[in-house]
């Protein structure tokens, strides 16, 4: 096996320092998709959204849809999630990803997928809204969502009780808590993310994964 030259190793390290992986996370109804679209455009990065991939798969695979709509949603959701990581690897770690990564079990999975994409320190944007507001927003849009999503108007959804107790950021890198109860200053958020990436590149030995920055729009 050939040896990697010092110059090539340096270039690889500089590339890793410059790449920006942004995870836009939060409860359903927290405003993730809206913020992620605007943020990706501001940063000049591709956007990979779980629901967009899931709905596309559902449209193409509709003839295979089983009777159990919840199982169908789960299967396509898992496929969509795997697709996000494949796209991130192809993008060499430079992208905005948007999905609801909620619950401790997902933290280990996301960390492993980031490792496989060569991402050491992601920037996480947590869409910070009260649970009651997120739930109201979500329930208002249920009748208008793509039919692959299994929720139906008026049906109880016990997941909200669990989310109210446990939902929070993954904390796999710096967390930018963004108040999404109203309009967000996207250029200012993008500037904060760029500054955080520069700081991580300047101090590659800093492994603190607990830093949080509250970002409130004016």
What are the functions of these language-model segments?
Residues 33:
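Walker A/P-loop
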Residues 24:
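Hydrophobic anchor at the beta1->P-loop junction of P-loop NTPases
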Residues 143-189, 208-211, 215:
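Small-molecule kinase domains that catalyze NTP-dependent phosphoryl transfer to phosphate-bearing small molecules
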Residues 30:
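ATP-binding Walker
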Residues 37-89:
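Conserved substrate/cofactor phosphate-moiety recognition/catalytic segment
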Residues 75-119:
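Glycine-rich phosphate-binding loop used to anchor ATP phosphates in small-molecule kinases
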Residues 27:
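P-loop (Walker A) phosphate-binding loop of NTP-binding proteins
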Residues 117-139:
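Conserved phosphate-donor/acceptor-positioning beta-strand/loop module used by diverse small-molecule
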């Amino acid at each position: 096996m050939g040896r990697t030259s010092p110059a090539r190793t340096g270039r690889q390290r500089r590339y890793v320092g410059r790449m920006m992986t942004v995870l836009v996370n939060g409860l359903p109804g927290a405003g993730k998709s809206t913020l992620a679209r605007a943020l990706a455009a501001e940063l000049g990065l591709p956007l990979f959204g779980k629901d967009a991939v899931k709905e596309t798969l559902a449209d193409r695979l509709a003839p295979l849809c089983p009777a159990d709509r919840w199982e169908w949603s789960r299967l396509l959701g898992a496929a969509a999630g795997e697709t996000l990581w494949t796209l991130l690897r192809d993008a060499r770690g430079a992208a905005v990803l948007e999905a609801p990564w909620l619950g401790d079990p997902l933290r280990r999975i996301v960390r492993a997928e980031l490792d496989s994409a060569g991402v050491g320190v992601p920037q996480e944007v947590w869409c910070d809204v009260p649970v009651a507001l997120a739930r109201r927003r979500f329930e208002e849009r249920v009748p208008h969502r793509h039919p692959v999503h299994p929720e139906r108007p008026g049906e109880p959804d016990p997941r909200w009780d669990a989310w109210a107790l446990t939902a929070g950021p993954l904390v796999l890198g710096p967390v930018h808590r963004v108040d999404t109860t109203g309009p967000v200053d996207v250029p200012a958020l993008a500037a904060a993310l760029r500054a955080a990436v520069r700081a991580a590149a300047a101090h590659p030995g800093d492994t603190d994964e607990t830093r949080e920055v509250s970002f409130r729009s004016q």
